[in-house]
A protein has these predicted regions:
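Hydrophobic alpha-helical transmembrane segments of multi-pass inner membrane proteins, especially
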Residues: 1-11, 15-227
């Protein structure tokens, strides 16, 4: 994968891939650690899907010569993301496992469509913010140190943010909700360079987490177990 990046994306950020590899490695180590306590070990399966994902990543990088073509599917990516996030809520194919309704079952096979939504949301955020960056930075009004964009310029991004909140409220998936919101804030910061957005987002995370902890039992149990 590193070789493919060097050949096809030599100007890509050199830190992202090593960080992802380290995080994935830590996850694999933790899974193998608890495998002995599970009736059906999943470490080897996770390792297989890791290898397959790396292969798919290499193929995409090799054949996607110009990443700017993804701007053409900005709104398609948003629509696809919303559809994927709604699928587990459907009564026929949606499945609730361990208190979280994030699975769909088709022909006896279970799958988390939210995993694909993470990719399509990243494509949407990148495409939309790169196109509307100047409007977000310049248009709107300033309140203290924070430059607020016009609401109409952030409507699509706001919809994506609502989708992440919906994941928490309706699917009881705290991890994915935090990841979606973190992705939203990271992309917004990279686009604008405004630290104030990170502060505002951090306040939103703390406030939302506090409310979820006291109002959603599944979230309370997850946080309690982690602490």
């Amino acid at each position: 994968l590193h070789v493919v990046l060097g050949l096809r994306a030599r100007y890509a950020d050199p830190f992202i891939l090593p960080i992802v590899i380290v995080l994935n490695g830590v996850g694999l180590a933790m899974i193998y650690r608890i495998d002995s306590d599970l009736k059906y070990p999943v470490g080897d399966s996770q390792l297989f899907w890791t290898g397959l994902s790396m292969l798919a990543c290499a193929v995409v990088i090799y054949f996607l010569r110009d990443h700017r073509v993804l701007r053409k599917v900005t709104y398609i990516s948003l629509a696809l993301s919303l559809i994927l996030l709604v699928l587990p809520l459907l009564p026929i194919i949606g499945q609730e496992i361990n208190g979280a309704r994030i699975w769909i079952s088709i022909a006896g096979r279970t799958f988390q469509p939210g995993e694909v939504a993470k990719i399509t949301l990243a494509i949407f955020f990148a495409g939309y913010l790169s196109t509307h960056r100047d409007l977000i930075l310049v248009a709107g009004r300033r309140i203290g140190p924070i430059q607020l964009p016009r609401f109409r310029d952030l409507v699509p991004v706001f919809l994506a943010w609502l989708a992440s909140i919906g994941v928490l409220v309706f699917q009881h998936d705290l991890g994915s909700s935090i990841l979606f919101f973190g992705l939203f804030m990271a992309m917004l910061y990279l686009s604008t360079g405004k630290t104030s957005w990170l502060v505002t987002g951090g306040i939103g995370v703390v406030a939302g987490g506090f409310l979820a902890y006291h109002s959603i039992s599944h979230v309370h149990d997850r946080i309690y177990a982690w602490v």
